[in-house]
Amino acid sequence: MKNEKKKSGIEPKVFFPPLIIVGILCWLTVRDLDAANVVINAVFSYVTNVWGWAFEWYMVVMLFGWFWLVFGPYAKKRLGDEKPEFSTASWIFMMFASCTSAAVLFWGSIEIYYYISTPPFGLEPNSTGAKEIGLAYSLFHWGPLPWATYSFLSVAFAYFFFVRKMDVIRPSSTLVPLVGEKHAKGLFGTIVDNFYLVALIFAMGTSLGLATPLVTECMQWLFGIPHTLQLDAIIITCWIILNAICVACGLQKGVRIASDVRSYLSFLMLGWVFIVSGASFIMNYFTDSVGMLLMHLPRMLFYTDAIGKGGFPQGWTVFYWAWWVIYAIQMSIFLARISRGRTVRELCFGMVMGLTASTWILWTVLGSNTLLLMDKNILNIPQLIEQHGVARAIIETWAALPLSTATMWGFFILCFIATVTLINACSYTLAMSTCREVRDGEEPPLLVRIGWSVLVGIIGIVLLALGGLKPIQTAIIAGGCPLFFINIMVTLSFIKDAKVHWKDK
């Protein structure tokens, strides 16, 4: 009994270091917000200007890796001996569900405004050219390229899970073929896991920092409750308590149902926006934007603006590539888990086609709606952002639709459920990664899950206190740096082991 307790308890070497590091950083930030903002700007400038090119090359190389998997010697290899666990339709639906987070609703609604007001390639702000390239850049940042990189890592994790039968809950577990068991389970593996966990904690905190203002702004619109930092903190606290109650009372089934409701409601809300906003314009704009994407793709892939120094690729492309890098392991583990029994080619094609369709639908519908509202002078987005903040501007793009009260209730419920499931997933992932061993079918310890949800909530509040998008972008970029190297190591480890294991079969 004692031994079982020890097994399911925390793993000190990967529990306490991230906790201490993140705690100290939060304390230093809160202690002097102005100084923290100076540091944040310096870190953002250094990473994006000095190392931005590395993130761009990483994505390009991983794209070539995707083609190698699809058309190479492993294309027909099956990831596990069993038949696929889910039907193709259910599998794609689960992929779509993984895309409908509140952070995605945040960027999908407002991103196009930033691209049009500060466009790439030296275009005039708010010009016809800027509007033509605006959605094309969203399709680039949230299209086949990043999903191709995820599919490569998903194949790697599915290989370790279902072919090599490894119990992978931390990235160090996958590095045995590359660095040897001694190093993977020793100091080197511990350092890798700690970097992964610190980056993941900040990534989850930033997602919460994006999602919370949407909910509190909805509350202000619906109930007249003023949006303040204190209200943000209260809402985050309520979510943490709700998550703790769900876990303590064994209501995980309820959380899964909530996740399904989120997916169906996402379809409903997107369909509503598509119909009432202007379906013909949306389809025409999408078609035009795909053409613009294909025409400018080579330049977009390698665009650093080294001569013009306008800052667009650093502020957006490098930021988003870091965003994809930082979430790669967590998302790839999930996508690998639901892909048991599929071939390498099936997984790669299914992910790129299914997930690209999901993100393209979201960005096209929401971005087109925002552009229409600006062009028709229904909303003054710059003024809303300056006077009330980005979250209010996003809320107003939804409130401007017909049946505004019903629409706002739908959006409020969608954001609320999305954030509840986000916190639940955060606490679960971090608890699993910081425990010694959690057997299949078991849940990680309650207190560990609650503890991590509290810490993620604190980070969200700290980022909100700093104000603006720059702290959130910097947290992602800084966290993406170590994950950049870890993702490469996982990829190389898979290639090295597959050459031996799959060659013999």
From Swiss-Prot:
Task: Tell me the compartments it is located in.
Answer: Cell inner membrane
Associated pathway:
Amine and polyamine metabolism; carnitine metabolism
The reaction(s) catalysed by this protein are: 4-(trimethylamino)butanoate(in) + (R)-carnitine(out) = 4-(trimethylamino)butanoate(out) + (R)-carnitine(in)
Q: Which GO terms describe its cellular component?
A: plasma membrane
tRNA processing is among the record's keywords:
no
Q: Write down the InterPro entries for this protein, in alphabetical order.
A: BCCT_CS, BCCT_transptr, BCCT_transptr_CaiT
Which coarse location class describes where this protein primarily resides?
Answer: membrane
- Its job: Catalyzes the exchange of L-carnitine for gamma-butyrobetaine.
Query: Subunit comment for this entry?
Result: Homotrimer.
Protein name in UniProt:
L-carnitine/gamma-butyrobetaine antiporter
| Species the sequence originates in | Salmonella choleraesuis (strain SC-B67)
The lineage is: Bacteria, Pseudomonadati, Pseudomonadota, Gammaproteobacteria, Enterobacterales
Q: Which gene encodes it?
A: caiT
